[in-house]
């Protein structure tokens, strides 16, 4: 492939595009000012249309990567975690930095808008560009199918490790990786424990694609505080990298990208991306590691490449959700993950619901409980109706199923979002109870979004206004 070129930030244009990934690059300090820089990868629906200005380059590269910058306020700099972070590591300090950076995203008018629709290929933006810098974004109100579909690459990665003599640390025994792209296939196998993947050691065929053909370093020039700053980022021949599901817990992907980071940035001491990984702490949800900066690409996980839905999500953001939300970013993260925006419930509905139920409540009908055990007994012949309500999300939520989304919202939402969710859930419970009264049904129990209703077997019950699956039985014990 050709030599990496440079992208300048001095040509004004407009472009229609969907956003496939947003990642942090780094902080830049200059003349007592601090700038945050984000990397935005897009799926172009129309090529940029030049307005005014001139480019510093005669033939700029056709990249899908653009940048957004933001000058920090003093209050935001004061909130920056003051620990001396190792910018190629993991841990609690890194998690605090990631959440602080997410608070910046939530405040930035462009990044916050793009983040809420990132991964949704049906959300097309009109982007106002100044070279490689995104200066403004407007969501197109007329929905239409994308003109260009996202391009996917596939990676299988596996590592084996064993404990050291002291049993305190893991030592890498082997690392294997295969990446299939439209450029060709890259294969790496290392049984020596070394993590650096230079192409001369891994090539099984002379014509095999090299790792830097797939992750191609390219210099980008942006203007920060009146000075031109160069940053090396990677161009890739895909919009999303799909990796095997075991990389959620296997350390292979972390080791591979750590080695690639050192290969590209080992000799660079200036402005460059960070290498931060947040491992999921809440194992009750099928979430994945979150790479907040390098490799600055969208990563999805799939147990079977053939059955992969070819959709993108932001479910990996769940790795940085915490119950102690000191940076007030949980609600922003949840909206990015689920695509759910919850408005306040109208006053008339809120006052008519009666009892308030928290989202995800579990309740049994006390009138049907016999004895001290929490069991409901129905002795007469009846028809059991199970109604399951699902959240109407704007786009795919990745590994999170429809049943897990309300549980995630119930656990991590705060403030007005939690209040609105609880109000709407209370109204849902009230509506189901009211429906039971109108149609001679008896409510048995509800658990999260599942409602269990019963009627006498001889009763004729009209079709509920929601999907119900009847199960006929003569004696039901829940």
Curated annotation (Swiss-Prot):
Keywords: ATP-binding, Helicase, Hydrolase, Nucleotide-binding. One of its GO terms (biological process) is viral genome replication. InterPro entries: HSV_HEPA. It comes from the Viruses. One of its GO terms (molecular function) is helicase activity. Signal peptide: none annotated. Pfam families: Herpes_HEPA (PF03324). Belongs to the herpesviridae BBLF2 family. This is Uncharacterized gene 40 protein.
């Amino acid at each position: 492939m050709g030599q990496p070129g440079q992208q300048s930030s001095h040509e004004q244009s407009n472009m229609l595009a969907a956003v496939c990934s947003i990642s942090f690059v780094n902080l830049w300090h200059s003349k007592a000012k601090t700038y945050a820089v984000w990397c935005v990868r897009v799926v172009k629906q129309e090529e940029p249309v030049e307005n005014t200005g001139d480019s510093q380059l005669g033939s700029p590269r056709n990249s899908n990567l653009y940048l957004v910058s933001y000058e920090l306020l003093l209050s935001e700099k004061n909130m920056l975690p003051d620990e001396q972070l190792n910018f190629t590591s993991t841990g609690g300090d890194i998690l605090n930095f990631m959440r602080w950076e997410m608070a910046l995203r939530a405040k930035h008018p462009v990044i916050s808008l793009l983040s809420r629709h990132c991964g949704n290929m049906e959300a097309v933006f009109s982007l106002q560009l100044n070279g490689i810098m995104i200066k403004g974004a407007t969501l197109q109100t007329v929905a239409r199918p994308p003109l260009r579909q996202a391009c996917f690459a596939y990676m299988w990665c596996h590592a084996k490790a064993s404990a050291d003599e002291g049993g305190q640390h893991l030592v890498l025994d082997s690392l294997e990786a295969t990446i299939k792209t439209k450029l060709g296939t890259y294969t790496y196998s290392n049984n020596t424990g070394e993590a650096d993947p230079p192409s001369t050691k891994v090539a099984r065929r002379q014509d095999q694609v090299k790792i830097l053909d797939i992750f191609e370093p390219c210099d980008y020039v942006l203007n920060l505080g009146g000075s031109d700053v160069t940053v090396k980022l990677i161009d890739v021949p895909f919009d999303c990298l799909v990796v095997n599901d075991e990389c959620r817990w296997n350390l292979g992907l972390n080791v591979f990208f750590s080695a690639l980071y050192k290969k590209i940035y080992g000799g660079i001491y200036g402005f460059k991306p960070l290498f931060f990984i947040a491992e999921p702490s809440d194992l009750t949800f099928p979430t994945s590691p979150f790479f907040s900066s390098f490799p600055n690409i969208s990563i999805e996980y799939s147990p079977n490449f053939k059955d992969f839905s070819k959709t993108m999500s932001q479910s990996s953001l769940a790795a940085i959700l915490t119950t102690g939300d000191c940076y007030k970013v949980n609600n922003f993260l949840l909206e990015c993950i689920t695509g759910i925006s919850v408005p306040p419930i109208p006053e008339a509905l809120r006052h008519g619901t009666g009892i308030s139920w928290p989202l995800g409540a579990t309740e049994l009908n006390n009138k049907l409980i016999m004895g001290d055990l929490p069991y409901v007994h129905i002795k007469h012949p009846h028809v059991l109706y199970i109604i399951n309500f699902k959240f109407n999300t704007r786009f795919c939520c990745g590994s999170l199923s429809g049943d897990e989304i309300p549980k995630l919202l119930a656990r991590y939402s705060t403030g007005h979002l939690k209040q609105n969710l609880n109000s709407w859930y209370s109204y849902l419970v009230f509506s189901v109870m009211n429906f039971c009264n109108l149609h001679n049904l008896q409510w048995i129990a509800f658990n999260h979004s599942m409602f269990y209703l019963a009627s006498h077997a001889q009763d004729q019950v009209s079709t509920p206004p929601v999907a119900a699956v009847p199960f006929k039985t003569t004696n039901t014990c829940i």
